[in-house]
Amino acid sequence: MRRLYCLIFFMLIIFMPSFAQKVAVDGYVYEQGTGNPVNKAIVTICNQKSNILYSGITSKEGKFQLLTKGEDLSLYTIKVSCMGYKPASCAIGNQKNFQIELEPKAFALKDVYVKAEKISHHNDTTSYLVSGFSSAKDRTIGDVLRKMPGIEVAKNGSVSYNGKAINEFLVEGVDLFDGQYNIATRNISHDLISKVDIIENYHSAKVMKNSKSEGGTVLNLNLKDKAKGRWSGNAKLGGGAPSIWEEELFAAKLSATNQTAITLKTNNSGKDILSENKILTLEDLLGQDVLDEPKNILEISQEKPGSLDDKRTRNARTHMVNISNVQKVSDTAILHSKIYYTDDRNISDIEKGVSYFLADSTLTKNTKEYSILGTKELVASVLYKNDGKKSFFSDELKYSSLWQRNQTKISGDYSNLSVIHSDVHSIDNKLKWIRPIGKHYLTVESRNKFQTLPEKLCVEADGQSLQDVKRKQFLSMTKLNYTWNMKRWAFSIDTKGILSVSNIKSNFMSDNIDTTFYENSSINYLSLIVCPSLIYKFKGIRSEIQVPLSVYHYWGLSSSDRVFYLPEWTFSWQVSSRWKLRTNLSLGSTAPSVNNSYVAPIMTDSKTFSSSPIINYWENKQNSAFSISYTDYTHMLFGNASVGFNWGKDKSNTTKWVERDLVFYSKEKGNNTSRGTMILGSLSKRIEGIRGMVNAKCLGFLNRATILQNGESVDYKTNMWQTSVGLNSNVHDWLEIDYQLGYNINSLSFSKAKTSTKLLTQALNISFLPIEDLTLTVMAEHYANYFSSLPSKQTIFSDIKCSYRYRKIDIVGSLTNVFNQKDYNNTVYTDLSSSYTRYALRGRTFLLSLVAYF
């Protein structure tokens, strides 16, 4: 036994040193710029001869641990490598814990082009590194999106990618804002976003991922880890002269499972916050046009110049509340609820000269118009969606009410006081179910909508004129689609049934016009639409032929049966990873819009009457379009160009009768031909030499149409061209320049006259950062308007903004319209008339505000 104890003791003495010498070398590997952990990076310890002694792989959290034998490692080197990053190494010395930063690098594989410093691309996803495009003066993700090549942010906030409008706007794959993504772009801090993904050929239903149907384009914001699952946002408190205020609160809790956003805003500073509640995604906008829905008949909107920012002309008091929540109720299902309310009161003051080009003369009416438009809107919706692997189901219920009141006082060549009430109330239900059956798909969709549109107009001018309109409509649509997939081919049958039942009651009475108009009629139809489609898809080629056949039965105001036939061919070809072609061609007849038809004339404003009787003839159409796009992700170059043609011929003519102070519009049987051409192109490139981006855009519309004015048929042409070039450069850390140059041409021509306007615009923003937390921005805008028969008009605006950041608080002072410009002139063309308008502008204002970020 003594020998056994001695043997055990002897062995412990031998092996204990080896156990004691096991030493752990650990650490964390992260990505430069974003701070995100790098997964599956290879970590090695090498000796002086570069021989690998120990190796390991980082975890999802970017962590690693290597166990050594305890030898002297001070002269050894630790090395880290990972695809898409530059290798990193450092001497070990006496360290045992390491924080290693990997710098992204560019590499190329088949169909994969990556420049991870700024832009990466894989298959259908293009990713933008937010830190690669942001600067010290940027606050929101919208500020950074404008600097990303290939992404265009329009004046109204809508986002497009290389010429294509986005279908959805997501945060961590969740559609929290339901198309109202101005809330996200104008309020979410860019510091919370690691990268922006643009995903093409995207299907919102997982079961459709491998289908041959054409997907959409979505934008997805990827959150940094620090932003997930916690409340973040900003609060703003501002006041200034003359008697202006601006108060805002935005708070959001964002993650991949549960999301909430709360927006509360109020101001009278001219800042447009109403647009944050506008639906901007292509999918939602197209959904609004699926059914033939009635629109407001009375003209209640206020005129504003399209070239100016709304802050120049808005003289409004606005309140806005928007609350949205997405709650995950199971592994695949969510419940999305939303409610928003807006209350806006805007004052418009304009001087207007309308010229009517008649056969033997030109009739001009000059007036001053002062109007107060009040708008209130309430919308509430709830959506249940189950996006599983075996099926997709969604059901949405939505209620909305819109109340509008416009009081307008007109003086000049004719004088009156008019008050318009125009409301819309609706309840809408949309249901969708998709079920894969083997390689095939069955889709069922249903939509039911009921709405009422009460409208009133009262005009006082040497007597009183009253117009009352009440409309109701019920729309029901059921759609059934079955798709057979056969390797490269797919064949589908789409069957749709639509029922529309509507009623209109209108009554016009006047003291000074010895006429009354009354109508109480129903406009109903039942339609069956069958559309077989054949799709071919192989590698980068996709071709689809649709042959829809529509049968309509009308009763009520007009009784008839009609058949419409509009075949369409779409072809797209991904020629290479950089070039893509697309063409579209359709030819046939389409059903007329009847839910906005009425026989008795309706007074739409204080000087216009309109009637829209149903003409029992359909319109023959030809449409064609061709587009080409180029993307070079490595060199950050994006370009696209497209041209479209349309030709239409129907058996109805638009008629216009100008008499004294009134204008009458209607329709009558006849032959009418219209032609149009659209040209669109854009180019954007990131240039590292200037630390910025250059861009160029061109948009042109060339249209020909015919109108029957005062009994004479007149062919006329309207042309519109908009071109612009821009430069954004972060010249130094302390200096950023943004310059835009634009040139627009609008013209109207017919046999007896030709007139046009030209507009040259320049906008320059210069931001100075003398110290890290102080930003001084000087903004200047120049508008040069050139008119055919009037002197040119030059207008210069200037704004100054100073911002100082103290920890998480911005102290901001802004001086708007420094030169105190009073008015702005603009001309627009409508059929055979032109409107020369002088708009009253907001005067000079000063606003001091505190913005706290959390």
Predicted regions span which residues?
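Conserved C-terminal beta-signal and adjacent last beta-strands/turns
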Residues: S724-Y743, S751, T755-F854
